[in-house]
Amino acid sequence: MPYTFGIIGDEDSIKSTTFRKNLREKAEGKQLKNGAFLSANAQNRLKRGQALAVALAIERERMLETKLSDDEYQLSFDIDATILAFNFSEKAIVSSHPIKLTLLTSLSEKPTENDRSKLANIMFFGDREKEWFQDLSGSYLITEFMKAVQDTEIRQAWRSHIRV
């Protein structure tokens, strides 16, 4: 995942730190379907049954260039990710929900590496200058992750029973 790792993979980089900060700010205080609230700052208290942690796991990326005509190219950046809920009391993943994101733009010239990097950066940080996307001032990935987390039922525990 060259673009993802190059942008947010180095934990000590400014971009990675900024991305995590933006994610924490968006998550703070959001209510889930089960009535619980997300907190990026408060620590869970296991004795009170606060054992869940929610994570975003990016599994795959794909940058695709398509020639539509002599003077039009399509550039798309896809990310496959999973929302994971981990129960610390049970030491188990209790929920896993896939999400797929695609950013798509049209260019009048063959896309350059700079264009590809720019589209990947928009996925993680948005297009504040509104050069390519008028309505995407913040991170597309964070926005869609938060929508999915809030629309997904996350249980405290998951029980599987197999009958033979």
Task: Please report, for each region that a protein language model flagged, where it lies by residue.
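Solvent-exposed, acidic/flexible segments
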Residues: S16, R20, S76, T112-E113
